Amino acid sequence: MVSRMVSTMLSGLLFWLASGWTPAFAYSPRTPDRVSEADIQRLLHGVMEQLGIARPRVEYPAHQAMNLVGPQSIEGGAHEGLQHLGPFGNIPNIVAELTGDNIPKDFSEDQGYPDPPNPCPVGKTADDGCLENTPDTAEFSREFQLHQHLFDPEHDYPGLGKWNKKLLYEKMKGGERRKRRSVNPYLQGQRLDNVVAKKSVPHFSDEDKDPE
């Protein structure tokens, strides 16, 4: 009698396992849910459509690819807000902020790029936001921007938060001008005849010529 009951229970358990059923006492937290990932994606897509942040996906089969004429463009980028990501639009999109060393960067006060001088045109003064009595030449512009890399407003002028063109111009006028080099030091000394440029015309001496 007991053996018959044991065999009946074992056969029932084997039938459950063969059918893919799991008894309640054998439930493990590692067992995946019966809801498929596709069902979850469809649910999330429906919620995002209700919120207005998901657009229906339009796909073109391979045989219709040649029917697309005219310029094609792709929208979306680093700073374009929420985007339609993933086949169901369910991939979370976070608008990233450009930072340096985890510190938000204020691009209005950026000192990373040189600021060219702004000489005053005829009839304008310094009150109009330009520099008076400055030479409007390319050489002065190069010198002006070169000094910006050496100019430290935080230490030289503690009250300033960004470049001050007027103070920089005053500093340039008071300092010693850099001497221009008119002689290239790399062209001095004895020339190496065995070193030739790649595009130079090959030179053959008379000794290398074949006797006629």
Swiss-Prot record:
Its primary localisation, in coarse terms, equals secreted
Q: Which GO terms describe its cellular component?
A: extracellular region; nucleus; secretory granule
Any Pfam family hit: Secretogranin_V
- What intrachain disulfides are recorded? 120-130
Highest taxon, organism lineage? Eukaryota
One Gene Ontology BP term is: regulation of hormone secretion
Q: Subunit details for this protein?
A: Interacts with PCSK2/PC2 early in the secretory pathway. Dissociation occurs at later stages.
Entry similarity comment: Belongs to the 7B2 family.
**Full protein name:** Neuroendocrine protein 7B2
The species this protein belongs to is: Homo sapiens
